[in-house]
Amino acid sequence: MRKGLVAVLAVAALVGVGVAGLPVAERYAASRIKAEIERDGQASVGTVEVGLIDRRVVLTDFRSRAFGDLTIRRWETSGIAGSFGDLLAGRRPFSSFALGDPLRADRVELADAHIADPSTGASWSVGSLRIDGLDLAAYDADATGPHRLAILAARIAAALRLRHAEARNASHVLAFAGDTVFVRSAALHGVDRGKIGALVIADIEATPKGTAEASLKIDDIRAQEIGLRRALTQVGDRSHPGRPLGRIEIGSASATGFGGTLLSSNGVSLESVSLETVRQTVDSSRSRLRVEDLVLRPGANLEAARLRVLLQAMGLSELRLGLDCTGAERRSKGELAVPECSVSVADLGEMKLSAEFEGADEALWRAVDNGDAAALPRSSVALASAKLMLVDRGAIDRSVRALAAVTGRPAADARANLASEIRGYQPPDILITQEFTKLLDTAARFIEQGGTLVVEARPDPPLGLAAASRLGIAGPDLVHLLGLSATLSR
């Protein structure tokens, strides 16, 4: 019993000595970190605070000229992956963190951070930034030239994993142009080396240089399953300026609450835009794009006067449009399709377009995925069929009334004259055949009767890119080349 008591007292004494010496060790580690940061004269720090138990380092008034002009009022990193020996000695990753170095930490918090590139005028600022579950792999930090910051940012993003990140009052000044993009808050979830599980942005504004009002505002942006790896690889390449970014994969995305002078000065308002992609198999997917409540109300300015007069003649004060388009790709079968793309205009009508392509090969997907337009002419993709449907819900009557108001003639005469002009239309450099005349007659009857006009194309054989060049020869037979037909129904 007595020996056990002595052992307990000995352990307690050791713990007591350790606890008593902890502040001394933390102050020593802080001094070593500060000395290491300022050793080469490229950086300075106001104060350094170290917590050995939670592997925490807090820097205040940090400044660096190692990669642009960087200032951070407060920088706290906790749960840092590293040994106690490194922490006590002030070695990396606890000090003099260099570009390209890996870093793992449970949490990183920044307050009032700003980085600028004096050579281009580009800058990034953030009022506060919190990152949970940081895992940054080593990356290539060798980048030079005017796009250095963008290249490094892309490489860092491609090497980054994190559980959650949230930024507030962030802004970016574009290189050379000087335009500013401001974001009140942004949050990322599940970032994995260029893939983002979820993104939420609130209150984003874009303001041109030298102006006080934002040209574009968006209240809310949300997205899920974002794939940026291809784009980050392109931007992270030293030769990336001017090259296309390629395809960015998005599972779903939406933006609501559009505003700003760019829209308001043209009498435009927009409620929402959304995109959803469903991946059915590894190589097949289906996407849907929707634009809701796009409204055009011509303003009082001179530029909008002509449109305002036209709408008034049609008995309208505004144009209210909606867009709903779906697309599908089945790569293993070499198929690409637009099952339906519709544009509706309130009180006027609707236009629907669909198309199917075959022979969608590797050259086409390379052009789509990488933005490699030079690969497109080598593709054997061909148009198999297409359909255009026009549904009249008042557009013809209103247009005829407007035409009558302009010409000062009765609406019935205006309608008859318009139908007659369509029947007699003879486009230059087009072979006028009996089938072509029938198409024009169907279109003219659409003006006379209204209803639904359907124009279909079924080229036989399917129209490839090489065959499409025949459209430019003198006097092509469009009806035969495209397999055109037209029908009218009430």
PLM region descriptions:
Residues 4-21:
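Hydrophobic membrane-insertion alpha-helices, especially the h-region
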Residues 18-490:
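Glycine-rich, small/hydroxylated-residue low-complexity segments
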